[in-house]
């Protein structure tokens, strides 16, 4: 694979500034790194942390952690990858292998974790470097743009749902019909659950049912928790809402020993302990996953025909893609492509 001297990248140069597309000298990988020729990179809400230095990566920084491409160069000490192989990378950008989390196999919880697109350069670029321990095997036949969101949004919902141990056949409610929510509905349905979608407005019901929801709750029509309880309640409520005010009512819709799974960074989340204690309810968070988890999520999606619904943007329109994601103009997921 021939390599250029320079490559294009979309970069945050200063705190709070918009993305700038520029040419930069191409760097070759270190001993334990891989150079990826990027095909597609999803645009995630958490990319905003890169814009505001939320994880201390500094500037300039290339965001993006839903990366799919092909191996362009293999580092001298990397043994299990070859040039031309399909490869991906998600939020998890590397780990130390020595902390308690790593010793238990929870590499994404590493005390010294690296984050693609936040503490190191990410995938809003024609090429990017990743650490070999963060690399994800991607099937050669899948569409890069459709599968890129699986590496964060899909992985997060898949890995969190399977780790809260809800029995097949139970009811799972999914609050929010965006990038995470539209994949959560599909994963939950394919896992064998009765799925109740919760969103605002009657116009979203058709899309929710097309994705696999068995029931739809319009939260504009009344308390979402009370409506969920009227449908029999849920063993699990998955929420992607950004405010605590939207999340708290869901507790009313949980059954005995029900679980609330929070997959967002909500502001002002206040929980009333009385109902939690009375009914044995619990609140859970889950930090995405590591490469093996991502490969499970991709394999499950491929085997069960789960599909990300995406809107594509060329790299030159990276700022437009980012703004469209933040404003909600993109219904499900924006993806930057290098075509």
UniProtKB/Swiss-Prot annotation:
Which residues are an alcohol-binding?
A: 65
Enzyme Commission number: 1.1.1.1
GO cellular-component term (any): cytoplasm
Enzymatic reactions: a primary alcohol + NAD(+) = an aldehyde + NADH + H(+); a secondary alcohol + NAD(+) = a ketone + NADH + H(+)
Query: Can you provide one Gene Ontology molecular function annotated for this UniProt record?
Result: zinc ion binding
Q: Where does NAD(+) bind?
A: 176-181, 196-201, 204, 263-265, 287-289, 295-297
> Does the keyword Repressor feature in the UniProt annotation?
no
Cofactor stoichiometry and binding? Binds 2 Zn(2+) ions per subunit.
What are the UniProt keywords, alphabetically? Metal-binding, NAD, NADP, Oxidoreductase, Zinc
**Residues binding Zn(2+) 1:** 44, 65-66, 152
InterPro entries per the UniProt record, alphabetical: ADH-like_C, ADH-like_N, ADH_Zn_CS, GroES-like_sf, NAD(P)-bd_dom_sf, PKS_ER
- Please give one Pfam family short name: ADH_zinc_N
Gene3D superfamilies, sorted: Medium-chain alcohol dehydrogenases, catalytic domain, NAD(P)-binding Rossmann-like Domain
Q: How is it used?
A: Notoamides have been shown to exhibit antitumoral activities. Notoamides A-C show moderate cytotoxicity against HeLa and L1210 cells with IC(50) values in the range of 22-52 mg/ml, but the IC(50) value of notoamide D is greater than 100 mg/ml. Moreover, notoamide C induces G2/M-cell cycle arrest at a concentration of 6.3 mg/ml.
Binding residue positions for Zn(2+) 2: 99, 102, 110
* Enzyme kind, highest EC tier: oxidoreductase
Superkingdom per UniProt: Eukaryota
Q: Which cofactors are named for this entry?
A: Zn(2+)
Against PROSITE patterns, the record matches this protein to:
ADH_ZINC (PS00059)
Protein's job: Alcohol dehydrogenase; part of the gene cluster that mediates the biosynthesis of notoamide, a fungal indole alkaloid that belongs to a family of natural products containing a characteristic bicyclo[2.2.2]diazaoctane core. The first step of notoamide biosynthesis involves coupling of L-proline and L-tryptophan by the bimodular NRPS notE, to produce cyclo-L-tryptophan-L-proline called brevianamide F.
What is stated as this protein's family in its record?
Belongs to the zinc-containing alcohol dehydrogenase family.
Q: What is this protein identified as?
A: Alcohol dehydrogenase notN
């Amino acid at each position: 694979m021939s390599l250029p001297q320079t490559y294009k990248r979309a970069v945050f140069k200063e705190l709070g500034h918009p993305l700038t597309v520029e040419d930069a000298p191409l760097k070759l990988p270190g001993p334990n790194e891989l150079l990826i020729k990027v095909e597609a990179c999803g645009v995630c809400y958490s990319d905003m942390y890169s814009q505001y230095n939320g994880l201390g990566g500094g500037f300039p920084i290339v965001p993006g952690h839903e990366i799919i491409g092909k191996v362009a160069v293999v580092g001298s000490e990397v043994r299990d990858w070859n040039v031309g192989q399909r490869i991906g990378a998600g939020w998890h950008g590397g780990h130390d292998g020595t902390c308690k989390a790593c010793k238990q196999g929870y590499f994404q919880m590493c005390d010294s974790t690296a984050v693609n697109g936040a503490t190191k350069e990410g995938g809003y670029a024609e090429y990017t470097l990743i650490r070999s321990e963060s690399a994800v095997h991607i099937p050669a036949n899948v569409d890069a743009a459709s599968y890129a969101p699986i590496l964060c949004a899909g992985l997060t919902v898949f890995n969190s749902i399977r780790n809260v141990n809800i029995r097949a056949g139970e009811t799972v409610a999914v609050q929010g019909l965006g990038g995470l929510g539209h994949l959560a509905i599909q994963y939950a349905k394919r896992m064998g659950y009765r799925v109740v979608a919760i969103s605002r407005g009657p116009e979203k019901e058709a899309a929710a049912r097309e994705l696999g929801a068995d029931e739809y709750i319009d939260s504009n029509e009344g308390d979402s928790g009370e409506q969920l309880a009227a449908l029999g309640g849920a063993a699990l409520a998955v929420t992607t809402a950004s405010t605590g005010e939207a999340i708290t009512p869901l507790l009313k819709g949980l059954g005995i020993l029900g679980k609330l799974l929070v997959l967002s960074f909500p502001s002002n989340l206040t929980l009333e302990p009385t109902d939690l204690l009375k009914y044995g309810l619990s609140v859970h968070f889950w930090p995405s996953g590591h490469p093996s988890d991502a490969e499970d999520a991709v394999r499950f999606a491929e085997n069960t025909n789960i599909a990300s619904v995406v809107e594509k943007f060329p790299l030159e329109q990276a700022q437009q893609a980012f703004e469209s994601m933040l404003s909600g103009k993109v219904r499900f997921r924006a993806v930057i492509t290098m075509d």
